[in-house]
């Protein structure tokens, strides 16, 4: 229940839109049947000559079918499902706004249905304005409820339209220009623009402001007793914080699972050693007179943008930029306070050659802040199986492989995990010592590859059932946080077939799993970060 109420995932919201549209369609169909029964023959048929009731049915049928069936299903349902997939986006541009857009619709439908129980109902048709909505035609509050219903559904559609427009304009895959967009995305995009231009008629006038003012007055009077507000005390939004626990985080994801500083510090150190740089300038100013600043940069794959936001939020500092000529984002921390926070997080948790760059960074920070008194805590000597350093290192450079060779007479299936590191020397050290330590932990070997090229590398590969189980057991204890977690889950499914000895019987299923792994993945689910 909590998941469906608070979910910001586009597929979840799309599912809710479709369920809501089906429910509204049944109500609208009932109205449609009544209208057709009444019009099936000349004269009075089933409504006993009650023309106001007929007008109410006509009005309700129009509102329900358009605002609660067609638009939620066609735009909200199929749009949320297909638009992110078709443009290569992980989600909508504003996931929390997506949640609000949907949950404005149920109260809107309730208000419309409630209008039928006040007086004789709102029988104005589309002209919900005077004289039909005046006191002579409708002396009660039925039209007010219908108008408020239109305001809510209108603002819901406006928020959704803004979300779709922003998503299509800003979250397309690199290289997907507007003329390459699928026609369905164009249809949603143009529809959203038309909605944004037309719906202020229903949702953006002065009347909604009055309605909201009245609503807030009622809200205050109802909840004042609950929160024990005295007569002379002003009721503010802070008074209701006990009702809603608002998790104000930068990405549209929960970060409670990474809030442990011990876990996050080791994970972050592994992430930096795997695909990060620590830059400390030798001179305060360049030859051209420009000031040089130290910085720490962490590289994330394009599809790991939510993880990049989470790391930025947990550090509390940093800027995210697109890496030029590469499908990646860079998180850069270059302000003094941010570097101090980062240094405290990873101090004593670095295992490889980047430790010497970290020492230079600490010296620079102590020089800039004499009262800091930050001291390097040395290399991380904790056994690999007892902290999350390796998890961050794998997040940066690990890959889960499923290989299939089915064209020959004897088909072959293999499962492996790989870690590759450059042999570049840092301060007289290479990554071989670290790679060898990981290999011993996983009970495998390290090989040197591309030795004849300019960029020789060390490669660690697990290929036996035992070594694959070792890496699985570790990552269950210290889970990955990015999209590699999705590859790991699929990889574990294939590993279970190998454990049971049924991998040859499930060849088709393994090929299907392989088709969605690594760079071929088209569907991303961030539920593991909820």
UniProtKB/Swiss-Prot annotation:
Residues 205-530 are annotated as: COX1 intron 4 encoded. The keyword Calcium does not apply. Disulfide bonds: none annotated. Its main location: mitochondrion. Its EC number is 3.1.-.-. Signal peptide: none annotated. GO terms for biological process: aerobic respiration; intron homing; respiratory electron transport chain. GO terms for cellular component: mitochondrion; respiratory chain complex IV. It comes from the Eukaryota. The chain crosses the membrane at residues 15-35, 56-76, 99-119, 145-165, 183-203. Mitochondrial DNA endonuclease involved in intron homing. This is Probable intron-encoded endonuclease aI4.
């Amino acid at each position: 229940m909590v998941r469906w109420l608070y979910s910001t995932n586009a597929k979840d919201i799309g599912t809710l839109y479709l369920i809501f549209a089906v429910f509204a369609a049944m109500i609208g169909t009932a109205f449609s049947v009544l209208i057709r029964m009444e019009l099936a023959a000349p004269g009075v048929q089933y409504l006993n000559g009650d023309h106001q009731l007929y007008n109410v049915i006509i009005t309700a049928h129009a509102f329900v079918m358009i605002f609660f069936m067609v638009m939620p299903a066609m735009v909200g349902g199929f749009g949320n499902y297909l638009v992110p997939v078709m443009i290569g986006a992980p989600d909508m541009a504003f996931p929390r706004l997506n949640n609000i857009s949907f949950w404005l619709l149920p109260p809107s439908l309730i208000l419309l249905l409630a209008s039928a129980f006040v007086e004789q109902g709102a029988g104005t048709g589309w002209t919900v304005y005077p004289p039909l909505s005046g006191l002579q035609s409708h002396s009660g509050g039925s039209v007010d409820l219908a108008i408020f219903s239109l305001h809510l559904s209108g603002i819901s559609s406006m928020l959704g339209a803004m979300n779709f427009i922003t998503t299509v304009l800003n979250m397309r895959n690199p290289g997907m220009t507007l003329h390459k967009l699928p026609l369905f995305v164009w249809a949603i995009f143009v529809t959203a623009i038309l909605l944004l231009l037309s719906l202020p008629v229903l949702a953006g006038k002065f009347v909604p402001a009055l309605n909201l003012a009245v609503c807030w007055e009622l809200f205050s009077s109802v909840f004042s007793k609950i929160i024990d507000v005295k007569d002379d005390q002003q009721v503010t939004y802070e008074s209701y914080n006990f009702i809603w626990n608002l998790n104000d985080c930068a990405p549209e994801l929960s970060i409670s699972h990474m809030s442990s500083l011990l876990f996050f510090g080791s994970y972050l150190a592994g992430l930096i050693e795997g695909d990060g740089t620590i830059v400390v300038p030798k001179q305060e100013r360049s030859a051209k007179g420009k000031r040089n600043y130290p910085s720490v940069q962490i590289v994330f794959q394009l599809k790991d943008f939510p993880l990049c936001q989470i790391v930025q939020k947990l550090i509390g500092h940093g800027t995210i930029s697109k890496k030029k000529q590469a499908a990646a984002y860079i998180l850069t921390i270059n302000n003094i306070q941010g570097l101090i926070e980062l240094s405290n997080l990873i101090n004593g948790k670095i295992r490889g050659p980047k430790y010497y760059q970290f020492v230079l960074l600490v010296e620079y920070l102590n020089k800039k802040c004499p009262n800091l008194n930050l001291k390097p805590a040395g290399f991380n000597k904790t056994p690999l199986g007892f902290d999350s350093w390796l998890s961050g290192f794998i997040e940066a450079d690990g890959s889960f492989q499923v290989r299939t060779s089915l064209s020959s007479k004897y088909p072959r299936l293999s499962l492996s995990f790989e870690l590759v590191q450059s042999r570049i020397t840092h301060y007289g050290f290479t990554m071989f010592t670290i790679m060898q330590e990981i290999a011993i932990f996983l009970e495998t070997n390290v090989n040197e590859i591309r030795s004849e090229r300019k960029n020789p590398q060390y490669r660690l590969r697990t290929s036996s059932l035992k070594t694959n189980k070792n890496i699985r057991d570790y990552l269950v204890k210290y889970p990955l946080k990015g999209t590699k977690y999705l590859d790991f889950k699929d990889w574990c499914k294939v590993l279970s077939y190998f454990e049971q000895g049924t991998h040859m019987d499930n060849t088709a299923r393994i090929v299907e799993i392989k088709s969605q792994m690594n760079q071929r993945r088209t569907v991303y689910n961030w539920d593991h970060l909820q």
